[in-house]
């Protein structure tokens, strides 16, 4: 129904929320196709939607724009602010009190914690080119 009358601007709120991965991909591809001749504004918490569709991103917090740029620009702005630390399960709680922690993955030698922030633990290995929009989200919103 949103496309009746061929509008030049589409406003979508969480267009892929609750969809299984296959349907999410289908909807994202459709939105990307529509964006060739329309302005599309969409609100989402699904970071992969942004990575696949957006050519410009506005991050809003309490109604204020806190960051803006292309996905690549936002990712590049995180250089030096994302690291990974290997620790034990017992150490996770303390690290979560001091740092913004992203994904926690099981590794052979313990747990790998993604750490995001202006200051990283000394033992953190900076991830370099392995930064994504999820890191940007954690930096600004967690």
List the model feature ranges, each with a label.
Residues 19, 45-47, 130-131:
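Residue-level recognition of hydrophobic positions within alpha-helical transmembrane segments
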């Amino acid at each position: 129904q949103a496309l009746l009358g061929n509008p030049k601007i589409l406003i979508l709120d969480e267009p892929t929320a609750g969809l299984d991965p296959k349907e999410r991909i289908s909807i994202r591809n459709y939105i990307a196709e529509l964006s060739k001749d329309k302005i599309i504004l969409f609100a989402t918490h699904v970071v992969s939607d942004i990575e696949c569709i957006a050519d410009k991103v506005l991050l809003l917090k309490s109604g204020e724009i806190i960051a803006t740029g292309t996905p690549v620009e936002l990712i590049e702005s995180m250089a030096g602010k994302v690291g990974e630390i290997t620790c034990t399960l017992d150490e996770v709680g303390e690290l979560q009190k001091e740092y913004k922690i992203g994904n926690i993955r099981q590794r052979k030698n313990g747990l790998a914690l993604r750490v995001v922030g202006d200051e990283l633990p000394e033992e953190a290995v900076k991830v370099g080119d392995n930064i994504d929009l999820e890191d940007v989200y954690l930096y600004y919103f967690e």
